[in-house]
Amino acid sequence: MIEKVYCQEVKPELDGKKVRLAGWVYTNMRVGKKIFLWIRDSTGIVQAVVAKNVVGEETFEKAKKLGRESSVIVEGIVKADERAPGGAEVHVEKLEVIQAVSEFPIPENPEQASPELLLDYRHLHIRTPKASAIMKVKETLIMAAREWLLKDGWHEVFPPILVTGAVEGGATLFKLKYFDKYAYLSQSAQLYLEAAIFGLEKVWSLTPSFRAEKSRTRRHLTEFWHLELEAAWMDLWDIMKVEEELVSYMVQRTLELRKKEIEMFRDDLTTLKNTEPPFPRISYDEAIDILQSKGVNVEWGDDLGADEERVLTEEFDRPFFVYGYPKHIKAFYMKEDPNDPRKVLASDMLAPEGYGEIIGGSQREDDYDKLLNRILEEGMDPKDYEWYLDLRRYGSVPHSGFGLGVERLVAWVLKLDHIRWAALFPRTPARLYP
């Protein structure tokens, strides 16, 4: 029986061996009485040589007409050839056309197409080599996170997506009818993770989060994947240490396993290699001083948006923290700084090269009365948070957590010009199809 192989397995060591290969036509070039088909699968590309005197007139004519993304199965002999991709090619003896394609809607070089065309045909675009590489890197970053979390004693939990209240502000909730009442799509699993720490102490989850923000920036999606951690007995400084160790492992492990894919997007890997903890830390006050010294029109108490973060990232060649934010610009659940009631014990991790925030974290408010007051100050209904307040009634402890935006991390690692390319099917205010 002829052995079925993947493209990445066609190497000079198989010289003289008969193999069977299934995939899609990437390019089709005729030179005299030979046709050179580049066939791709999920692992790479192989050159298949179709010679008229071997396959016959009928098969040769079929091969001539195969357009890009035609699906085929070929059988043939592996021949070592340093000119071929991977140093070997397949000399075809049999060609089976599963489906012939005459014209593919996406150019051979997708970068020549407009972003709108690529997004309209996203269901086809994701099969192109660079789009596939992005998904492989994303998958590997998550795999690396799981490795580190398992090794460090964290428990994975599975929180709900349908919720009754806001975590990050009511204005950004997606509302939907839930039988005879209303529910919302989750903005974050955080509150449910906080409940889980009283039994499991260190927990994490990977879920989609939804934000009804009409932000049209290169780093916002309305649906994104959220890697969130929560731990009992940790303060802000403890959880920042967890963040940097986790991110460092994710990036280094992905560099180890996906260097080829990363090099499709980055010529220089220095910045990614430079992720050994500890990461630099600056206070919000210091960040304001840096921005003002660079002529940015910002005052103490202002939130730091994409433009301000971009300026700050110019000061660092690796991820770094900004901590100690003003209370009024942060979420209700963050613990007040006991040394300065104007601030909360919160931090953001910013990626260099202009990418900005990839993680938001904080120590959580563990005092019942203070948390209730913050809920009321935000104009929210305490009834929606009765169960959450219960966590402060029965054995409350100091605890902290954070959320990592997976697509933001992918965008930085691969130096993408827009976060939408890090999502399989991106959701933005302007796009819900396909």
Swiss-Prot record:
Its main location: cytoplasm. Pfam families: tRNA-synt_2, tRNA_anti-codon. It is an enzyme of class 6 (ligase). One of its GO terms (molecular function) is ATP binding. The keyword Acetylation does not apply. Its EC number is 6.1.1.22. One of its GO terms (cellular component) is cytoplasm. GO terms for biological process: asparaginyl-tRNA aminoacylation. InterPro entries: Aa-tRNA-synt_II, aa-tRNA-synth_II, aa-tRNA-synth_II/BPL/LPL, Asn-tRNA-ligase, Asp/Asn-tRNA-synth_IIb, NA-bd_OB-fold, NA-bd_OB_tRNA. It is found in: Cytoplasm. Keywords: Aminoacyl-tRNA synthetase, ATP-binding, Cytoplasm, Ligase, Nucleotide-binding, Protein biosynthesis. Gene3D superfamilies: Bira Bifunctional Protein, Domain 2, Nucleic acid-binding proteins. It comes from the Archaea. It catalyses: tRNA(Asn) + L-asparagine + ATP = L-asparaginyl-tRNA(Asn) + AMP + diphosphate + H(+). Belongs to the class-II aminoacyl-tRNA synthetase family. This is Asparagine--tRNA ligase. The gene is asnS.
